[in-house]
């Protein structure tokens, strides 16, 4: 049974007033519908095509809803099966009286671009996607969209575009823009073939026989994870170390990498099963009210019935300002942030949330996000694991089995744990959250008795991504959900030596060097008196026992007991300097090395992958290219980490050696102006590695979403007052 879409109540209709559109586009619509019928094959048996050019002309002329189906490029795993979903959506839009169109945007895969020049284009691609979508929607005068949501920068790029369109249409006095999002299904993580597993276990045994127990343990750690693109990087790092020590040959290394790679991805694609930016975006956009629950959490491409439910709901949204994309997003911003936090979402989304709000016309920044995040404690209700059968594919199976309801369940459990949620906010079902949650069946997390991903009882009473301040920078972020309580304890209120790099390549090379700690010791990279002070701060119980040790012995003792803390700083990676690439690989090399993992944090003005875990601090502002304090740091400087208090400060080293915690950076900055100028010159030279057409000059900083300045300047609305949550009658637009 179909529903009937109302005509668009809008005095503006280029297809009525300009004959060229009615001459050009009917063949495009007919072609799309013909292909859709062919793709769906037997499912269309008995359906007689009624999409004549004359009928298409009439619908265009009379302002039937023109709905763009926005897909992604099939060179990204999330979009391999778009053709099928496009076909289902096109047929249903036509059956309901609309006019379907289709276009796709390029979609960068951050995994494919990882650790190569492509990563400098990743963040910029979000704004490029937004621009391309706005261009196409405005040029062809589409009223709404059905979005096949993929991974990485595409989801929030399209959210930003459509919120921007809604705002500009409303400014021009036109009908509100409506949209619904359909996340690609979850890709099933790969399994290591049993024969390969045995081979790699043999490598671990060989490592033990060579006295390389650390490699054996790290390799077995990697073997405990589901197979995915990010775990391949962990294997790569451990196998390189094994090769350096003569445990395996280069040829064996290549064979292992090949066998792992080809076993990684399921042939139907989807969004990778880890809780990275792709699945974090799934949860976030659902929390924004923009995803129909029928399509939110699937293990396979959607059926026709599932697509129909989403598209049919558009009938109650069309012409209703409450259900304009920008209004839905802003009305749900607190819901979205609390779901993002409770589900351990990606740090990337800190920028993307801010950007989407700015594109939607709302004045918003990182500090607004932080205020919402800390208005009330947000418990950790996400028991996600890549080693214990609780990845996002497992969550999707729990939802598809009818035991729970995905983000509706998380929304419910947040309220049960005392978190205020905006239940009156509109969603793309054409109803509010309150109406959606009034159906209690399968709502509680207790519906999954065994190995649940969503919990009713919190793991911890805090979660999410924290904003950090310090005396040498204005803002940075750390994914507190990505750190265990033990890790927090390990680095909190600790003094850490800076190990400085001005580019990621140098950092990666160094972090893979088996002799890194020995070289730091041999080069006397850290001042002896400062090492004694660090020992006293970080391990006071051992201070009297160890403080008189000579340099080498003290270094070894502190490294062995974990008292030596190192902040690996990768500078010059900000959006303007180098496109803000992810520092996933250096952090992965730290995490895959049990010696370094106890000692090292990573600090950068770059980003991190959504799958990154551990003590990874990024998005530092101002970035090095803009004279931020990170530009002036040197190996051997000392930072004081207060992660629970959300602070990192530069220590006065001389006072620290005297047993005092005094924070002073300005004197150091003034003394290092010449060093800063030398580094800025190197940054400008290195910047030429990125195509000039795609550099992000004229953009806001990471705390303000990294959006074009014009977008930020036009964002003047208040996200709490300039929204509409009052339900309006059908066809409310006049």
Question: Each predicted region: which residue ranges?
Answer:
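Short acidic loop-to-helix transition motifs that present clustered carboxylates
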Residues: 108, 128-133, 153-154, 187, ...
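Internal mixed beta-strand/loop scaffold within catalytic domains of large alpha/beta enzymes
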Residues: 79-82, 138, 144
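N-terminal small/polar loop signature for handling phosphorylated ligands or for N-terminal nucleophile
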Residues: 103-140
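Glycine- and acidic-residue-enriched helix-capping/strand-helix junction motifs
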Residues: 76-86, 580-581
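A short, small-residue-rich loop immediately preceding and capping a beta-strand
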Residues: 69-70, 140-158, 181
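Small-residue-rich anion-binding loops in enzyme active sites
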Residues: 81-113
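Catalytic or ion-coupling anion/metal-binding cores of large enzyme and transporter domains
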Residues: 1-75, 93-98, 102-104, 118, ...
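Short coil/turn segments at secondary-structure boundaries
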Residues: 77-81, 117-125, 150
